[in-house]
Amino acid sequence: MSNYVFAMDGVLCTPCDDFMEAHNCKPIINAIEFLNWLVKEGHHITVWCERPNDLSWVMATREWCSKYGVLYNRLLFDKPKMPTFVNETPCNASNYGYDHDVGEVALLFEEWKKCQNTKE
């Protein structure tokens, strides 16, 4: 099985700047469903956050993941901030949708999941 790394803010949930407000982050459902599908398929998932490795942030993030059923094998903090990070783009990536409710690309994960299913 493969190893996958997911960013937290902007990928699994709306961005959060204050741990006191972390519980208000909206989940990006398609991304969470895709991540959970990968876990259930036996893949190793790391969630890597730009959030600081501070006890308050760690606890708030773990609670949020538990609340929304986000499955993962490893949770990391202090990810460097980068404007763009591209790695192993999915086939037909130009055919993604846009989730207007949370302002994030979300339907891309459905296309990726379809591509992964065709590799079997």
Language model features with spans:
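HAD-like aspartate-dependent phosphatase fold
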Residues: 1-120
